[in-house]
Each structure stands twice: as C-alpha cells, then as structure tokens.
C-alpha cells in the first residue's frame, strides 16, 4: 500500500440511503455567485437565492461531504435536498433557527 492510497471495495456507494429527499428549483436573483456547501442548512442560505424556503427547513444539499453547489447570477437550477439527521438541532449559520427543528 502507498501512503494516502485508497482501497475501495468495488460497487456503488449510496449516499443518505433511506432519508427523505426533496427536489427544488433554486434561482440566484443577486449579482454575485453564491456557493452552498454540502452540510449548510439550506433554509438559511443567502436571501438572494429564491426557492420554497419553508419546504427546505431541516434539509441540506444531497451531495457528497465537502462538496458544494455554485449558483451564478441569474441562474436557476434544480437541486436535491436531504433531511438533516441526528438530534435535528441547528445552531449558527444565519441564526434563523438556533435550536430544535
């Protein structure tokens, strides 16, 4: 084995198996690009992103950890969200929840 080398079992890896997901169209109404990370509470994203915010409460992007989605000014794209797991308590971000979902 080479230091840092990955030895991955053949086959598919399903992310967030069994969790509820939701697809939303999201538009950037601002004049700057907006990037949202994999574990950011989507409900609390930049206000220049327009979408069904209430539906996104308690959800994050359904993408691999450490990755992000970038929304260019004027761009609309469909994203898939997945429910937050664990104790379902949210602190920080934009400060809109600060406790239990």
From Swiss-Prot:
It comes from the Bacteria. It is an enzyme of class 3 (hydrolase). It is found in: Cytoplasm. Its EC number is 3.5.1.5. One of its GO terms (molecular function) is urease activity. One of its GO terms (biological process) is urea catabolic process. Heterotrimer of UreA (gamma), UreB (beta) and UreC (alpha) subunits. Three heterotrimers associate to form the active enzyme. Belongs to the urease beta subunit family. This is Urease subunit beta. It comes from Pseudomonas fluorescens (strain ATCC BAA-477 / NRRL B-23932 / Pf-5). The gene is ureB.
């Amino acid at each position: 084995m080479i230091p840092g080398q990955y030895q991955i079992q053949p086959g598919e890896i399903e992310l967030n198996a069994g969790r509820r997901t939701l697809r939303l169209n999201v538009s950037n109404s601002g004049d700057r690009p907006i990037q949202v990370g994999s574990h950011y509470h989507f409900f609390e994203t930049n206000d220049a992103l327009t979408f069904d915010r209430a539906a996104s409460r308690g959800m994050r992007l359904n993408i691999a950890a450490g990755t992000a989605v970038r929304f260019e000014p004027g761009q609309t794209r469909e994203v898939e969200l997945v429910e937050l797991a664990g104790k379902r308590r949210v602190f920080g971000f934009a400060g809109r929840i600060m406790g239990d979902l």
